[in-house]
Amino acid sequence: MGLARLHAIVEGEVQGVGFRRYVQIHAVRLGLKGYAKNLPDGTVEVVAEGYEESIQQFLNYLWKGPPLALVTKVTHKLESYKGEFTSFDTY
């Protein structure tokens, strides 16, 4: 599998529950680069780049979330790899 870019919006109880840190830990473990960012509407935007296989595994973690989170929806699309990140950050 080649390189790809994931763009996802995660809905539910995902702010103030450690969701971004949880996402960051799993992204780094899977070798992904990008970011997780709280949005004003209560969702979390996630952009991650890396190998497609790792991105597919990562999607499972987005659905699961940390213990205090309650994920109700993950809207995502795979895009062309851009190689613009050097780490995985949270905002």
Curated annotation (Swiss-Prot):
PROSITE patterns: ACYLPHOSPHATASE_1, ACYLPHOSPHATASE_2, ACYLPHOSPHATASE_3. The keyword Metal-binding does not apply. InterPro entries: Acylphosphatase, Acylphosphatase-like_dom, Acylphosphatase-like_dom_sf, Acylphosphatase_CS. Keywords: Hydrolase. It is an enzyme of class 3 (hydrolase). Signal peptide: none annotated. One of its GO terms (molecular function) is acylphosphatase activity. Belongs to the acylphosphatase family. This is Acylphosphatase. It comes from Metallosphaera sedula (strain ATCC 51363 / DSM 5348 / JCM 9185 / NBRC 15509 / TH2). The gene is acyP.
